[in-house]
């Protein structure tokens, strides 16, 4: 008799102590949402309602730890779900230097709450998944969380009905030819007055980010060595200027703003450990590192953008900047110290 998914999970967990649910699901050949669904009536419960309602209710629970990740990077931030703007398909939870999120809510498909026994004690969380079964965002209780408010939220949203997960395969992006010449893309780029116009430029011209970078002049985009992330984090830690680190997936982008306290490499990973923020990023998976300069009404905004071999954007880094103010000269100086990659090599 074949084992249930839950029994397979228990076996995989016993065989691979210390591995996270995401990794166990991969070993089992299923999505993390399917794995979590199998745990319902054990250490998980299904939550009803749409993501907006759940996110709005989280405002009452006080401080939590929020985790957003992709295959290559994990972004952990302590904060509160305050200052929410969740209209339409796009949403904001806007708390710079605290919990700062950009949400693409049409990607949010299911949610669960988990109560897990760990070697550090019981761990409570709410976890959101997309239509493909990948985790978009996770919310963990901390010592500062208002537990009566957390329990009240769960009482409101836990459902005894356990509908089947309606998973959809990820449609492969259409391979299309760019619709504009390199010269036209370069001219459009130079005409931008806001960094958010960049998405429209890509869409209009059927371009990926990297195709756009290759189309424009080296004063707008150029490649640097893949060690640049570690180099830049160390410089920012030494000089103590505020930077921004973006990590996202199909449905959520989480943003850190602040000074870097501690940078620690470990095996293939580069890690940042702050009191209220942690970054874990697999440095060996960085296939391309680009410096980009985008014009705004306040002058150019410079970023380091990191990509995996499959084209996934792993992370983006900026200097801290307030709307209406020019970019930090210190950030530009730090970027200028990075080693250019010899693209002809």
Curated annotation (Swiss-Prot):
InterPro entries the UniProt entry points to: Heme_Transport_Util_sf, HemS/ChuX_dom
Entry-linked Gene3D superfamilies: HemS/ChuS/ChuX like domains
Alphabetically ordered keywords of this record: Ion transport, Iron, Iron transport, Transport
Top-level lineage group: Bacteria
Gene Ontology BP terms: iron ion transport
Similarity section: To Y.pestis HmuS.
Function: Part of the binding-protein-dependent transport system for hemin.
Protein name: Hemin transport protein HemS
Organism: Yersinia enterocolitica
Organism lineage: Bacteria, Pseudomonadati, Pseudomonadota, Gammaproteobacteria, Enterobacterales
């Amino acid at each position: 008799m074949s084992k249930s998914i839950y029994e397979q999970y228990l076996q995989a967990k016993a065989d691979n102590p210390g591995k996270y649910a995401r990794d166990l699901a991969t070993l089992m050949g299923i999505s993390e949402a399917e794995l979590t669904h199998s745990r319902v009536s054990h250490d998980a419960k299904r939550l009803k309602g749409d993501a907006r309602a759940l996110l709005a209710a989280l405002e009452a629970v006080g401080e939590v730890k929020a985790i957003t990740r992709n295959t290559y990077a994990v972004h952990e931030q302590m904060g509160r779900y305050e200052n929410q703007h969740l209209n339409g398909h796009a949403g904001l939870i806007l708390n710079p230097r605290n919990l700062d999120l950009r949400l693409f809510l049409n990607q949010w498909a299911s949610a669960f709450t988990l109560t897990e026994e760990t070697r550090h004690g019981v761990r409570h969380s709410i976890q959101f998944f997309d239509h493909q079964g990948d985790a978009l965002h996770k919310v963990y209780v901390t010592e500062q969380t208002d537990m009566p408010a957390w329990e009240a939220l769960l009482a409101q949203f836990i459902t005894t009905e356990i509908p089947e997960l309606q998973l959809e395969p990820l449609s492969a992006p259409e391979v299309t030819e760019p619709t504009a010449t390199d010269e036209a893309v370069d001219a459009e780029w130079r005409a931008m007055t806001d960094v958010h116009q960049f998405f429209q430029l890509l869409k209009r011209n059927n371009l990926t980010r990297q195709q756009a970078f290759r189309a424009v002049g080296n004063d707008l985009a150029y490649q640097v060595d893949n060690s640049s992330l570690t180099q830049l984090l160390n410089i920012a830690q030494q000089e103590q200027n505020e930077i921004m680190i973006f990590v996202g997936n199909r449905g959520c982008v989480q943003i850190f703003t602040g000074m870097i306290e501690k940078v620690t490499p470990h095996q293939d990973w580069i890690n940042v450990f702050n009191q209220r923020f942690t970054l874990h990023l697999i440095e060996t998976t960085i296939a391309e590192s680009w410096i980009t300069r985008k014009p705004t009404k306040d002058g150019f905004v410079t970023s380091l953008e990191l990509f995996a071999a499959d084209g996934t954007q792993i992370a983006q880094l900026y200097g801290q900047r307030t709307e209406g103010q020019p970019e930090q000269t210190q950030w530009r100086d730090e970027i200028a110290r990075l080693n250019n990659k010899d693209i002809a090599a």
